[in-house]
Each structure stands twice: as structure tokens, then as C-alpha cells.
Amino acid sequence: MTSFNDVVKWRRMFHQYPELSKYEYKTTQRIKDILTSYNIKMIDIPMETGLVAEIGQGEKCIAVRTDIDALPIQEQVSQDFTSTNDEVMHACGHDIHMASILAIATKLKEEEEQLNGRVRFLFQPAEELGYGAKVMAKTNALDDVQAIIGFHNYPTLDIGEFAIKSGPITSAVDRFEFKIHGKGAHAAKPEQGNDPVMALGQLITSLQTIISRNLSAFDSAVITIGEVSSGNTWNVIADNAYVQGTVRSFKPDVQDYIEQRMHDIAKGLEQLFNIEIELIYTSLPGAVINDVELTKHAKEAAKKVGYTVIDLEHPYTIGEDFSGLLEHHPGVFAFIGSNSEYDLHHPKYNPDERILEKIPDYFIELIYQLLA
């Protein structure tokens, strides 16, 4: 029977040997070895990394998803199971996620005959790149699935806290880049050039008017500039300028509108400053939108196993590519407290392993509800 010590051991193994997105070959094999040792069958999918497993039988099918990739971060936590791979770390807690889903799979395998349907386990690669879920969704991984359930650990929540809401629970994440091509000149003779920095300054100001003047007060979004660059000396007007940043939004129509307004602004500034502006807009994970009925079941299951359920008033503005699995299937996603002093993606991120105690119980309770 799977014990808490087993789950901790699995988590520490994954933590010690992390692998980056798209290169989770050994991680995939370790997962497969554990599942095979419990006689859990695998489903063939056309992906190089990641895997799908299933237990039970019948028409009903619930999918449980975990991400499996790590981040390009040098760990700064000294412990017996510190990452052995330089500049690679499970700084987002996917080791916690994998161990938890393995615990659910192995525990349910022991009571497989009691299941009124099938449970499919999705070990998904490349979450940190923002598209692993979409790639998996295009395979046979979701065939016959009625609902998809998942979670993410959350450092600012205490152990035993469970945060959820129906509707959007995370934001869509987009990246934008503007490449501004002007004409350089001597700083004393600006009339001989087309200054890209003037356009850059106007662009930065104009982008913020999208939020304050183009969106309804009832449609929230964030536009943040992360990088600005132009030139490399004090007395020369550069030929080019560059700016990039991110957009966070919660509705597809708002997401599309912001992108269109950025194109409109770029065209206007081209005419105003007689320069060229290239916009590269990349949509990464969409917003995770929780199904209303599934959210009710999730809350009930969480309370039943002893979680303190927090009803979120607003979504988190972080990205989560679980949304890529929900384009044609209902699902529910929750945040469970991991009580780390340092946040996700920090080199000193160190979740409290007590988080592993209740997660399997919550998912098993929810699965039985959904298969009833």
C-alpha cells in the first residue's frame, strides 16, 4: 500500500533529477517505472516525453493531470536531495505535483474494482513553455474523457488551505515585442534622422491607454513593460529601439482586442514618426476557466478531507497551461498551500512536504464523486 513516505521519496527523487521542458526523458522513464511496478497500464501517445496511464473500466472517464518539467534555475537550497543538474531546478513544484498524482494512481489501483469508470493520468511535459497541454490535447490522450481535474501548489497559502473559484482562476499570458526601425544620426543633428526613441516613449505611454481608455471598467487586464533598449552611447541617435512585455487578461475577446489595439497603435506611430514598427505578439497559455458544477464538487471534496476552502474573489494573474486541455473539455483547477518562504520560480523556493498528505485524499474523493 502506498504510504506517505513513498510519496515523499518520489518527490525527492524527482527534485534531485530535474529536467527542462521538452527534455523530460529520464523523468518520463522514472514515472513509467513506478506505474509499471504497480501494474498500471500505459496508453501509447505520439509524444517524445510525457505519458498517459489509465486504471478502471467502463464508459465514464475522468482525467487527472500533472506537469513534469523543471526550470532553468540554479538551486540555492542546501538539502540531501538538492538538484544534481546544474542550472535546472524544480522551482515551480512540479516534483510535488508528480509525486501526488502517482500517489493517487497507485492508491486507486489498489481499489480498482470499486471504481465506477476509468481514471486517466496525464503526465504532461513542457508546461513552462506554455504549450505542453495543447500538444497533448491534440493526441489521443483525451479520447472519451468527460472532465479534467488538476492543481498547482501555491507558496503563499498555508498547509491545509485550498483556493478555488468558478470561472477564470488564472489569466491568459501573452508576450509582445516591438522592434522599432528608425534612422540614426548625430545627437546634435536630430533633423537628419528619424529618432526611434521618440517613438519608443510614445509607444510605452500609448500602450497603457489601452487599459485605462479602451477597456470597460468591468474588463480587467494588465500590460507590463519588461525590457526597453536602444543605442549604446550618449551622443548618437540609434537606428533601432526595442521593447517587450506581457499582457495578462481573463477573457478571449479582451485578449484579442488588446492585440488589435497594439497593431493599431504601431501603425499610427509609424506615420507620426516616419519609422517602421514590427509587432511580434505571441499568445501563450489561455486563462484557466473552471466549470461551475465541477467547482462545486471540488469544494465539497476538499472540505470533506479537511481542507480550509478559500473562495477566491479574483483570479490569480499567473499563467497555467492547464487551459490547453480545456478547449473541448470541462475541468476544474485548484491551488493548494505549500507554505514556502520564497515564491514559485525562486532559487530558494522550498515547499513544505506536508502538502503531500491530503492531496491524494482530495483527488480520490473528487474522482469518486464524479464517477458516481
Predicted regions and their residues:
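Acidic/His- and Gly-rich active-site-bordering loop/insert found
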Residues: 1-90, 95, 99-102, 106-115
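Divalent metal-coordination and catalytic microenvironments
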Residues: 14, 53, 64, 94, ...
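Histidine-centered active-site/metal-ligand motif
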Residues: 15-17, 90, 94-97, 152, ...
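Non-cysteine beta-strand/loop elements that form the S-adenosyl-L-methionine
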Residues: 63-65, 74, 176, 333-338
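Histidine/acidic-residue-rich, glycine-tolerant segments that coordinate divalent metal ions
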Residues: 71-73, 79-89, 96, 113-238, ...
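Short amphipathic alpha-helical face segments that pack within enzyme cores
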Residues: 99-107, 198-202, 358-365
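Metal-dependent amide/peptide-bond hydrolase catalytic core
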Residues: 204-372
